[in-house]
Amino acid sequence: MLSRHVTDSLALIRTPFYLYDMELLDATLRSAMREAGRYGYRVHYAVKANFDPRILDRVRLAGLGADCVSGNEVRAAAEAGFDPRSIVYAGVGKSDAEIEYALATGIGCFNCESSQELEVIDRIAGRMGRRADVALRINPDVDPMT
C-alpha cells in the first residue's frame, strides 16, 4: 500500500507514467529463484514484458536469464549485462543481421521454429566460424483433444 506522502507526490507528476515497486520486484525475483533452485530449474525473464534497463538490471542481479523474441530484446539483454550464455532467443522471423549479432554475442541458445530457420542459423554460424546451440520446436501433429 502506498503512503499518503507517496500518493501526494504522485499527484504532481504528469501522466501517464510508470511506477515500479522495486522492493516487491526484488522479493518476487528472490522467491522465484529460491523455488526454482529447489528443483534445479533455470528461470528466464521474458524481456518483452518490460525492457527498462533498471528492471533488467534487477532481474540480472537476481540471477535470472533472459528470454528474448526479437533482436532488439537480445541487444537489450546484452547491454544490461546478462551473461550471454543465459540469453535464449526464440520467435519467428529472425533476420540474418539479428542472428549474426546473437552469435557474435555468444547467446546460450536459439529456439528454432522450423528446419529452414535451423539451416539459416547453421549457414551463418559456419560463415562466422561459430557454434550455435539450438532447440528445435517440433509440431508432432497430435490432436490433444482439448
Please annotate each region the language model reported.
Residues 134-139:
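ATP-grasp fold ATP-binding core
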